[in-house]
Amino acid sequence: MKVLMVSEDLPGAQLGGLGKHVVTMANALLDAGHEVAILGRKAGDPAVCGFRGRFIGAIALAHPNWKESQLGCYNPVKRPWFARHLAALIARHASGFDVVHYHGHLPLVGAYVDRACPFVQTRHDQGSDCLVHLRFRGGAVCDALDARACAGCIGPAPGLLRQHVSAMAVDGYRDRTAAAFARHKTIFVSDFLRRRFQQARPGANLRRARVIPNVVDMARLQAAGSAPEPGHIVLAGRIDTGKGFEQFLAAAHARLPRQARITIVGDGPGRAGLARHYASDQITLTGWRDYDSTVALTARAQLCIVPSVCEEACSTTVLEALALGRPCLALARGGTPELLRYQRYPGQLQLAPTMAALVDAMAPLLAAPVPAFDARAPFGADVRQVLPQLLDYYAA
């Protein structure tokens, strides 16, 4: 099979979960004997992302603000304009491929891709109905469904006119996205994401949609295998809004067991502030590390914590901890409860209702050794286990 993966996130040296998923899946398809290319950005060095196949650097669509911040409202024309241009670019490169698989940030692009094109897209976040892709505002999860409420994310005091214009933009975006999902195959990385979109567009036709989770490369993870270090707690991710690092440290720093050592791996706009307030003999912020270094730290952890206060769709960080057999603590939000099915042993993934309850759960987990498990047993989110599901969907 000839597959063209498409993503605006590639190439990139610091890949998030979406970019890692695309590269992992594309390399697995290559290993299985398929012909794979990635259509990505013109800028950047393709070699740094780890893809072993042909890279087509053609996406040059910058995403300027279009003065939305200055105007205090969302522009109804902006996102459809970008989607049309990306669809035209896809059309220019789709010839000769059996599947064109888009992983990106413009879910409405499928509404502009010809019905005859074998187009599939994967939705990795809440950007199907939320223009900031996160559904998180004012330090809390946003459950608003009325498009007028979205004006509050682009300006602090939108007023009736700005609310109306923003609502036009959001409603149009959601309608075109629903049209894209009805027109072409769509993968959601969790059932949570599928349900979320249905809440925003109850009449959406999702009969062609399927849930296929994010994946990890089990062979690569096993190569980093190490014994857990007693008391070592590892947190990894971008230190940004919604990821919960600040809330976790605020709740935990004064209550750490004496033997506990916390390593926080990652960069982002919040790192400097966290380092100023919380760095100590027990708390280390390493900054960004490459993937293999981060996985090696995870393998040495006695406990992994994913403190996201936003609703994660399908946390690759949680999957990596589970794959390595490490106990993992997270909040019971978003798609994370769906990951219980990937536990190596009962109780491996513990879900807390609040940050205070999550912190309470640390000490008992640190007091117990990491349970033994069969590292050779198949892991359900290993790319080699998931690949047949993807190929079946391609062929459907």
Regions found by a protein language model. Give the residues of each.
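Conserved acidic donor-binding segment of nucleotide-sugar-dependent glycosyltransferases
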Residues: 342-356, 363-369
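Short hydrophobic beta-strand element within catalytic cores of glycosyltransferases
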Residues: 303, 327-332
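A charged, aromatic-enriched C-terminal amphipathic alpha-helix characteristic of glycosyltransferases
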Residues: 353, 367-395
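Acidic anion/phosphate-binding donor-loop and adjacent secondary structure
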Residues: 198, 207-231
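Nucleotide-activated donor-binding/catalytic signature segment of Leloir-type glycosyltransferases, i.e.
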Residues: 272-292, 296
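A conserved mid-protein helix/loop that constitutes part of the nucleotide-sugar donor-binding site
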Residues: 20, 231, 235-254, 269-272
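Membrane-proximal helix-turn-helix segments that form the acceptor-binding/catalytic region
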Residues: 127, 139-186
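Acidic donor-binding loop of glycosyltransferase active sites
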Residues: 299-313
